[in-house]
């Protein structure tokens, strides 16, 4: 193996650039040529491919987003799209790839491996919804961004004795809301993985007010419902001064945290090691603070589970 490619796919996440940097520099250290593929699988099919060097990834580790850009390309699920990608890989002499993205990106990685190009997947998503990894690249930064916003919103909530419902990203996973809720001292956390009762929440808020706590912050995962709808349902059970806020794509941006930079560097380096061993169709993760790899096919039938012990802790520490 002499040449490998790197692409980022799906939603961007802080730390993707750190992962690209690690893959590129580790591969170059091992004597490999490295090619960057712009715009994910769409760029692969279009042949938007360029040779990288050490300076290409210089001054990138601290930057959010992805220097390789990203795009969704559902056509790659079809054989025709895959064959067009294979044609471009052959044209540039690329023999293996590292794909950085969410669960959808892993399907593309498996398809390319089946076509004879070993491909390793790295979990790049703020949602932390990938099975067989405790953390995904970008999750820690996203939580820190949310917590900073929660701290700021709590200031104004306290000033006006209001209850803020803060909706955060995460798709069908509640990890961002859960971790941010505990770190931000939220009065309640609503996630898809756990049932909730609006009437009981209203009752707890009222009891808290009677004890002198005149303001509150509630973290709501977007996979449950929209913040406005939740606030409307909550208002039906009590006389609360409610405000709803949506923390949208701001959570995906910004410089990656130190933890995400280190995690991305570890995963990127390990991905190259796996390729040098002739392995493909593997998904890299971190489990119990150890970098691991699993057959990517096992991820499709598995389901990520939120750390419900953390949910219990959140309940014990609120109201």
Curated annotation (Swiss-Prot):
The active site is at 127 (proton acceptor). It catalyses: beta-D-fructose 6-phosphate + ATP = beta-D-fructose 1,6-bisphosphate + ADP + H(+). ATP binds at residues 11, 72-73, 102-105. Substrate binds at residues 125-127, 162, 169-171, 222, 243, 249-252. ADP binds at residues 21-25, 154, 185-187, 211. Pathway: Carbohydrate degradation; glycolysis; D-glyceraldehyde 3-phosphate and glycerone phosphate from D-glucose: step 3/4. InterPro entries: ATP_PFK, ATP_PFK_prok-type, PFKA_ATP_prok, Phosphofructokinase_dom, PKF_sf. It holds the Pfam family PFK. Mg(2+) binds at residue 103. Allosterically activated by ADP and other diphosphonucleosides, and allosterically inhibited by phosphoenolpyruvate. Keywords: Allosteric enzyme, ATP-binding, Cytoplasm, Glycolysis, Kinase, Magnesium, Metal-binding, Nucleotide-binding, Transferase. Its EC number is 2.7.1.11. One of its GO terms (biological process) is fructose 1,6-bisphosphate metabolic process. It is found in: Cytoplasm. Its cofactor is Mg(2+). GO terms for cellular component: 6-phosphofructokinase complex. It comes from the Bacteria. Its main location: cytoplasm. One of its GO terms (molecular function) is monosaccharide binding. PANTHER family: ATP-DEPENDENT 6-PHOSPHOFRUCTOKINASE (PTHR13697:SF4), PHOSPHOFRUCTOKINASE (PTHR13697). Catalyzes the phosphorylation of D-fructose 6-phosphate to fructose 1,6-bisphosphate by ATP, the first committing step of glycolysis. Belongs to the phosphofructokinase type A (PFKA) family. ATP-dependent PFK group I subfamily. Prokaryotic clade 'B1' sub-subfamily. Homotetramer. This is ATP-dependent 6-phosphofructokinase. The gene is pfkA.
């Amino acid at each position: 193996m002499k040449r490998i490619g790197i692409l980022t796919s799906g939603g961007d996440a802080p730390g993707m650039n750190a992962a690209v940097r690690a893959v590129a520099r580790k591969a170059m250290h091992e004597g490999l040529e490295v090619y960057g593929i712009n715009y994910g699988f769409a760029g692969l099919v279009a042949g938007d491919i360029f040779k990288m060097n050490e300076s290409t990834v210089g001054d990138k580790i601290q930057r959010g987003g992805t220097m390789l850009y990203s795009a969704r390309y559902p056509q790659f699920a079809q054989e025709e799209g895959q064959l067009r990608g294979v044609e471009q890989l052959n044209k540039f002499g690329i023999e293996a790839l590292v794909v950085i993205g969410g669960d959808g990106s892993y399907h593309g990685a498996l398809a390319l491996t089946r076509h004879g190009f070993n491909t390793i997947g790295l979990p790049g998503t703020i949602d932390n919804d990938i099975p067989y990894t405790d953390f995904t690249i970008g999750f820690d930064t996203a939580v820190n961004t949310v917590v900073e916003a929660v701290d700021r919103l709590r200031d104004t909530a306290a000033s006006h004795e209001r209850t803020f419902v803060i909706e955060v990203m995460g798709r069908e996973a509640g990890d961002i809301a859960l971790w941010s809720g505990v770190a931000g001292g939220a009065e309640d956390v609503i996630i898809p993985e756990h049932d909730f009762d609006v009437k009981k929440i209203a009752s707890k808020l009222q009891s808290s007010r009677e004890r002198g706590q005149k303001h509150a912050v509630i973290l709501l995962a977007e996979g449950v419902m929209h913040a406005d709808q939740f606030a409307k349902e909550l208002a039906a059970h009590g006389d609360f001064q409610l405000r709803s806020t949506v923390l949208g794509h701001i959570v995906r941006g910004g410089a990656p945290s130190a933890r995400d930079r280190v995690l991305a560097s570890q995963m990127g380096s390990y991905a190259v090691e796996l390729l040098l061993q002739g392995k493909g169709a593997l998904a890299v993760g971190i489990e119990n603070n150890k970098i691991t790899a699993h057959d990517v096919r096992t991820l499709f039938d598995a389901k990520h589970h939120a750390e419900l012990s953390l949910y219990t802790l959140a309940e014990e520490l609120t109201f």
